[in-house]
Amino acid sequence: MIVLGIESSCDETAAAVVRDGRVLLSNVIASQIGEHSKYGGVVPEIASRKHIEAVIPVILQALHDAGMELSDIEGIAVTRGPGLVGSLLVGLSVAKALAFSRKLPLVGIHHLEGHIAAIFLSEKVPEFPFIALVVSGGHTNIYFVRGFGLFTLLGQTRDDAAGEAFDKAAKLLNIGYPGGVVIDRLAKEGDRNLLNFPRAMKESLDFSFSGLKTSLLVHVKKHGSPSAREDLAHLVAAYQEAIVDVLVEKTLKAAKMNSVPQVVVCGGVASNSRLREHFMERSREENIDLFIPPPVLCTDNAAMIAVVGENLLNKGKSEELSINAVSRWPLDVAGSFR
């Protein structure tokens, strides 16, 4: 089955064509980073307007790159939530229009399930069940995954997501946006062991990054923001390491607690080079099979949405054209919508 995926949950407008849920034929992403960087974060109104401008060209480019016509598409999958409602509605409206005009089946997809499913576009794929860490700007969750649509939430952030912890640190230090990318790049020049930031490593599988953020703020108030690039690199390297340590250790702990020797790491923050490196180191030590999509499939994209869509469409699932966007949508109850 050839599926067109559409994603517009935040600040990337994306479209992709995927065959049989495994073969990526095209993957087009229009980023809005340049539009939002001056504000230090995503402005919902601007995001919605930019999606309107980009969505049709992006879909046409995805079809062109795949060597396809719209008549070749057999089903449409679109992100339904969670996300910014104004942004979601752009992709959802276009998907509905295409489905209606071409008489194609349509399925609305949970954004986080898409992130988890991105791994099935890799050469090496896990078998069910597995543990999944979904780590992004808005989410930091650990799931027990028994199959498509079958998720049990094991742990989540109690305050900021890991991506927010990166972005807020970058804003505090005035080093640019998006914070995770800037910190990842700069941290490579620093020594992560020169400073020691706190790790919230309680018995629970839940996360908390508020104490880490406060610790950085106290450090800056006491010592000032580093003026020398070398000192700044040491600071962000140590801060990044504190985030990475917690993400890795709690995820591997979840795998051991549930006797599941397979871990999938996904979401935008999964493109962080130190996180990938440390997960590889620790998973080898713990004899756990690690699966991480390539960076281009970690950030928001429509290919991952098409993968989930293909699975649902092959089961005969489809949505009414009356479906609406869902701004808040727990993944472990997503199946109740189907």
From Swiss-Prot:
Its main location: cytoplasm. Fe cation binds at residues 111, 115, 300. Keywords: Acyltransferase, Cytoplasm, Iron, Metal-binding, Transferase, tRNA processing. Pfam families: TsaD. PANTHER family: TRNA N6-ADENOSINE THREONYLCARBAMOYLTRANSFERASE (PTHR11735), TRNA N6-ADENOSINE THREONYLCARBAMOYLTRANSFERASE, MITOCHONDRIAL (PTHR11735:SF6). Required for the formation of a threonylcarbamoyl group on adenosine at position 37 (t(6)A37) in tRNAs that read codons beginning with adenine. Is involved in the transfer of the threonylcarbamoyl moiety of threonylcarbamoyl-AMP (TC-AMP) to the N6 group of A37, together with TsaE and TsaB. TsaD likely plays a direct catalytic role in this reaction. Belongs to the KAE1 / TsaD family. This is tRNA N6-adenosine threonylcarbamoyltransferase. It comes from Syntrophus aciditrophicus (strain SB).
